[in-house]
Amino acid sequence: MNGIRDVVREEQPRERLLLEGAGSLSNRELLAVLLRTGSKEETVLKLSDKILHQFDGLRMLKDATLEELISIHGIGISKASQLMAAFELGRRMVRLEYQNRYSIRSPEDCAKYMMEEMRFLQQEHFVCLYLNTKNQVLHRQTIFIGSLNTSIVHPREVFKEAFRRAAASIICLHNHPSGDPTPSREDIEVTKRLVECGQIIGIEVLDHIIIGDHKFVSLKEKGHI
């Protein structure tokens, strides 16, 4: 009996999932369940290992394109589609938890709301959350993608959506692809410019959160707002 269970453990991840639960599986085993089969040359677990190695683990894999996936020997359109669909479902499930008028009472609340969506992005994304008078999220919008500087982040684009949504206040966020959320001089200058504009037009910029890899910095807590 122990021998059979050892085979299940090592070579049949789907059966192990049924016996022990999905939480007991490693990343390679979960990936193998999604792939279902290997190729003529290698088992499904070997194929899983190859994929994880190619993308340096889950961090890069979650944003893999169709072209990148099918470039791997043993991955065709069908397997690539299964993986991409699974990753998108995961992203949507994370969003579902917070989409019903999520209330932001602290920098921690804001970071929790956006962390999983932003921490793996490979380019800087500047995002604004538009809040009502109860600090509930009315809308969020990506203002631009690219390196942050004062010439790119124009207050007009930030506050235009605030007027459209009748927002009482704004929280700005952007990610550092390096994983280190330490603010740069440009980050601070952009923040001060937006705060000044908000004071003039009567829409408060509550904070600017920089997202790293499971870390964040609040420029309000740092004294820059």
UniProtKB/Swiss-Prot annotation:
Residues 103-225 form the MPN domain. The keyword rRNA-binding does not apply. Zn(2+) binds at H174, H176, D187. Disulfide bonds: none annotated. Pfam families: RadC, UPF0758_N. PROSITE patterns: MPN (PS50249), UPF0758 (PS01302). CDD domains: MPN_DUF2466 (cd08071). GO terms for molecular function: metal ion binding; metallopeptidase activity. GO terms for biological process: proteolysis. InterPro entries: MPN, RadC_JAB, RuvA_2-like, UPF0758, UPF0758_CS, UPF0758_N. A motif (JAMM motif) lies at residues 174-187. Keywords: Hydrolase, Metal-binding, Metalloprotease, Protease, Zinc. Belongs to the UPF0758 family. This is UPF0758 protein BCG9842_B0662. It comes from Bacillus cereus (strain G9842).
